[in-house]
Regions:
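Bacterial N-terminal signal peptides that target proteins for export
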Residues: 1-7
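Short, linear, compositionally biased motifs with a strong N-terminal bias
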Residues: 10-13
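N-terminal signal peptide c-region/cleavage motif recognized by signal peptidases
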Residues: 15-20
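Sequence context surrounding c-type heme c attachment/ligation sites in exported
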Residues: 22, 26-145
Length: 145
């Protein structure tokens, strides 16, 4: 039951990201939002496989995890500038606690990379999604409106 709740949270996040982008004027905020949307898209690939809405493909799952790792490494770079926009959901705490924000991002990058090398079967994917979702939640709880 907890797992399906976690999956629901991931899909709610993905939906909110899509609607949040309309009307954003600041280019730095747009870059951040696009990076987050791409992360959500890759998480969705994994979630769809776990929910068996799409067939399991080990290579595609590994690729999605590798992309999540790469995007996590890029995350601090797109947040260096404290840009604002009425559509931004970034809390000011990001810049007050940039080292902690960066650490959470690097932790997710490492987790995603390790998981990418270990996913062989659909049974490997469920715990992988749980770990990824926990990493996303750790950052969003603290740094996202």
């Amino acid at each position: 039951m907890k797992f399906f709740k976690l999956i629901s949270i991931v899909f709610i996040f993905i939906s909110s990201v899509v609607f949040a982008h309309s009307g954003v004027k600041d280019e730095n905020v747009k870059k951040r939002m696009m990076l987050m949307k791409t992360m959500a898209d890759n998480t969705k690939i994994i979630g769809q496989m776990v929910k068996r809405k799409t067939p399991f493909d080990a290579n595609e799952a590994r690729l999605a995890l590798e992309r999540l790792s790469s995007l996590s490494l890029e995350t601090p770079e797109v947040f260096i500038i404290n840009a604002s926009d009425p559509k931004s959901e970034a809390k000011l705490a990001i810049w007050d606690e940039f080292d902690e924000f960066t650490k959470l991002s690097m932790d997710l990058a490492e987790t995603s990379s390790v998981l990418a090398s270990s996913v062989e079967t659909i049974d490997d994917l469920r715990p992988a999604l749980k770990q990824i979702s926990s990493g996303c939640k750790a950052c969003h709880t603290k740094y996202r409106e």
